[in-house]
Amino acid sequence: MKLITFSLWGDNPKYTVGAIRNAELAPTIYPGWKCRFYVGTSVPNPIVWQLEAFEHVEVVMMDVPGDWTGMFWRFYPASEPDVEVMVSRDTDCRLGAREKAAVDEWMAADKGFHIMRDHPHHGFPILGGMWGAKKGAFPTMREAIDDWSKTDAYGTDYEFFANVVLPALENEDVMVHDEFFVKREFPTPREGLEFVGEVYDESENNIEDHTRVLKNFLKNKIKK
């Protein structure tokens, strides 16, 4: 089984509508893959029903409303023996061709773990919605999550990856796509100011400041 995993809680349309939008995009961007949404009890029923209506979507209802520690739910499949490969994504981002080309390159390589960074602000070892793992790459993920002292704060998953996951990985088993910090280009040219991990609201508006930062970085890169 090939999985695209998401965590979802609350009623903020930035995330709930984003979840629906990613479910709509998945068959085109990731044909043959399934989406699995880990959903807190705080998500409105109509959103849950819409997700359940997609044939390629699995909804796993959690028994708690959800908070920032819910970010970890989507990481669980890395430990499941029937999951061939999984990629973890954010509901406020959008699946796209640029990331899929990077995933395809990783899938064809003899590497178990995949990391993407595609913006000057992506200065973390592993971003919770921009990584993937093949079966066996980190089989103790569930146990590691259970043992980690999670906090209800944005970025708690970044700390987990930096302190627990990354030190346990062997460098030769990791493929990184990142032109900013590692200097490994994505396999497809950047179209305009697009970037993997770009955040959108429920009306498909992005964050202008993020675009400006990327534009300035690329402009300076060309000058050099």
Task: Locate predicted features.
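A short acidic-Thr-Gly-centered motif at the start of a beta-strand
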Residues: 74-82
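Conserved hydrophobic/aromatic beta-strand scaffold that supports enzyme active sites
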Residues: 77, 113-115, 130-132, 160
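Short aromatic/hydrophobic "clamp" motif used to bind/position activated sugar donors
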Residues: 86-88
